[in-house]
């Protein structure tokens, strides 16, 4: 039967996605202008936010860039926002985009070192509880000084390496060369036993990825360089590095301890998708791979590992002291790693950018949705409600509403909007300087902690969800939400209790010890 133009067009639209999914996106595209022009732009704006979250939730059906991009283009065409506003949002977040483009590519060129270090870690720590704790703690420690996206990129690179090694062996490709095999194709596996082992290995990797992902949130909230919005809040409040850490400590340290405890309990009782152990067959494969790699490592390869280790030290120092924009530091890593490790072919260099560029494009689309949120004042009623509450209730309300909005929007945007509103209230004499500082802590912790609830709440989680690794280990949107649920509940509740009951007395105590001083009004208002 001859294919008609219409049927060919329908088949081409969103490719292999299910027909019901294609229909849903078409309905969204038809309904949005009708609601915007005939009902209410405010409702249309929230409808767009819900639809965009839907595309993220269905990431395994179709990469969200396509349907999300169509919705974003339409929102600009019908006037929900303007190209200029989108351009402003991209300009405000240029540092994040540069980070994705260059830092993730830079990590790619340190893959040999990362695989070497983490293979030793994986093989030497046989207890899954201790291994999970090590991943969570290491991710938290790194995220306190590096960006969470960088840390997640490292973990993804390592997990992909482990997965590829076993999949190649299970597919009778013991040479470890994954360049010509689709590691997502289980039909190449030689036996059902290998398939069952691979399923257990996937569950093992999923749990480590989630522990590390939550670890980035636990560490990222502690310091002013941990997350982009932290820096904005610190500047607004006039805090330095040590000041910021001490101000947050009454909330972040108890939350950190409880987060590590949750990590141990989840592995101990094997609930919410955790508890899977490293299969012995996989351990044997990785041990043999490590033995062969060690025995066959030439002097040139040893020098590469040393060079990559030195570049890693440069990376940590440069990021910790903010010697340049994060993305530019990533570019320096690319230049140093390729130059000193002998990677000179354009195609070999180009592979490093394959992982991050689709997500960079998706994040740019996300900034269009954020522009709609700003243009249509979608969060304004919530912000006004919180600011009109009694001072005794403001801390808890700021914390909770920040967490709620950060779960569906951009953390940087939510944190910026709230800190600007709080500062304006202080400048207008509505709240005192002391209350403003307490609110700044509530805003920062509220933006960072409850937002682990959904992948779109944390850029690092979204990056993990849309990475090439996620479908390999069967990590979907729903599964991420389910696995993050115990962390979400504990971190949110402990954070709320600390904000409400321990923040004020602990801050007062630190002030009495002269560890903290109120910044000058000029510092807080500039």
Curated annotation (Swiss-Prot):
Membrane topology label: Multi-pass membrane protein
Annotated TM spans: 13-33, 98-118, 133-155, 208-228, 244-264, 309-329, 355-375, 395-415, 452-472, 481-501
MF (Gene Ontology): sodium:proton antiporter activity
Main location: membrane
Keyword tRNA processing found: no
GO cellular component: plasma membrane
Keywords, ordered alphabetically: Antiport, Cell inner membrane, Cell membrane, Ion transport, Membrane, Sodium, Sodium transport, Transmembrane, Transmembrane helix, Transport
Catalytic activity: 2 Na(+)(in) + 3 H(+)(out) = 2 Na(+)(out) + 3 H(+)(in)
Localization annotation: Cell inner membrane
Keyword Ion transport: yes
Cross-referenced PANTHER family: NA(+)_H(+) ANTIPORTER NHAB (PTHR43302:SF1), TRANSPORTER ARSB-RELATED (PTHR43302)
Its biological purpose: Na(+)/H(+) antiporter that extrudes sodium in exchange for external protons.
Similarity section: Belongs to the NhaB Na(+)/H(+) (TC 2.A.34) antiporter family.
Protein name listed in UniProt: Na(+)/H(+) antiporter NhaB
Lineage of source species: Bacteria, Pseudomonadati, Pseudomonadota, Gammaproteobacteria, Enterobacterales
Gene name of the record: nhaB
